[in-house]
Each structure stands twice: as structure tokens, then as C-alpha cells.
């Protein structure tokens, strides 16, 4: 990562637009391809997929951006433990999202993915409070609102991906008769 890279408000909003456009394609495809019956079978595959995806995201992010971003907002021990914490927390969150989605009298895919987006915005509100847009030089001057907005659409994309992976895992399990 170039030391002089600057994440600006404009870049965050452009990123939000890109994620929103991808979400606008991803969600209808999931609604088309994942029936309510199938979604009910995705309880544990979504937990496993979420744990693995979020472990991977955080292992990559901490590995790539520890010095330039995360060392400014996390304690030193987080460099080792955040990916593992994400593994456990994401699995638990996936279970909660799945339970919420099957209980709400609304589209289960939209509930699962949009609530994932809300969680993203909440985590970025926390990051803003910790100084994510004021402490790291590469983010100084970026709008806190833009950081929260991009998180909403970015996390919808991640939770759509988790749901797609869960469906693939479930399909493979049925085809290969695993467990």
C-alpha cells in the first residue's frame, strides 16, 4: 500500500455507489435462487460461511493495513486476535440474522442482507468514535458520514456473499451426502 494513499470522502461515496450497484444485482439474484425452504436449511451453512468469510476479511485487512490504519484504533493485541474474534462474532451474528429473517413477516433475503448492512453501519459508527477518520493519516479528513454510508452497502455485499456461499455449501452437502 503506497504510504501517500489518501482515502477521501469522494472515494468513499464512489465506493458506496459501486457496492450499491453490486447489491442491486446480487439481492434480486438471491431472491430468485434461494427459496424460503432453502433458506431455512441454510442456518448452519450461513454460520460457517460467515465465520470463514469474516475471518478472511479481517486476517487480510489486519495484515495489509495494520500499520496504516488499524494500529491507530485497536490495541496491539488486536493484530493477532481480531480475525479470531471476527470468526466467533460473525458466526453468532449470522445465526442471529438467520433467526430474525425467518421470524419477520417480510422477505427473508432482504432481512438477512439489509440487517447485515445495518450492522456494518453500526460497526463503522463505533470505528468513527475510535478515530478511524481522524487518527490514521490515510483517512484524515474523510467524512465520518461517508465511512458509515459505504459500510452499509459494503456489508450488504458481504452478507449476500455469505448467503451465496451458504447455499453452495448446502448444495454440495446434499450432492455429496456429507453429514
Give names to the regions the model predicted.
Residues 1-179:
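Aromatic-rich, lipid-facing transmembrane alpha helices and their immediate juxtamembrane interface loops
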Amino acid at each position: 500500500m503506497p504510504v501517500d494513499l489518501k482515502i477521501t470522502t469522494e472515494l468513499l461515496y464512489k465506493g458506496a455507489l459501486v457496492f450499491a450497484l453490486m447489491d442491486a444485482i446480487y439481492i434480486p439474484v438471491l431472491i430468485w435462487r434461494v427459496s424460503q425452504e432453502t433458506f431455512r436449511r441454510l442456518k448452519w451453512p450461513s454460520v460457517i460461511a460467515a465465520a470463514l468469510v469474516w475471518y478472511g476479511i479481517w486476517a487480510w485487512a489486519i495484515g495489509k493495513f495494520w500499520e496504516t490504519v488499524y494500529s491507530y484504533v485497536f490495541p496491539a493485541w488486536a493484530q493477532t486476535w481480531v480475525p479470531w474474534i471476527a470468526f466467533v462474532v460473525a458466526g453468532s451474528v449470522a445465526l442471529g440474522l438467520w433467526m430474525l429473517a425467518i421470524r419477520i413477516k417480510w422477505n427473508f433475503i432482504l432481512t438477512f442482507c439489509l440487517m447485515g448492512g445495518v450492522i456494518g453501519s453500526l460497526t463503522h459508527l463505533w470505528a468513527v468514535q475510535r478515530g478511524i477518520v481522524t487518527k490514521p493519516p490515510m483517512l484524515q479528513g474523510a467524512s465520518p458520514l461517508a465511512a458509515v454510508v459505504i459500510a452499509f452497502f459494503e456489508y450488504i455485499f458481504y452478507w449476500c456473499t455469505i448467503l451465496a456461499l451458504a447455499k453452495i455449501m448446502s448444495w454440495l452437502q446434499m450432492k455429496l451426502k456429507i453429514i
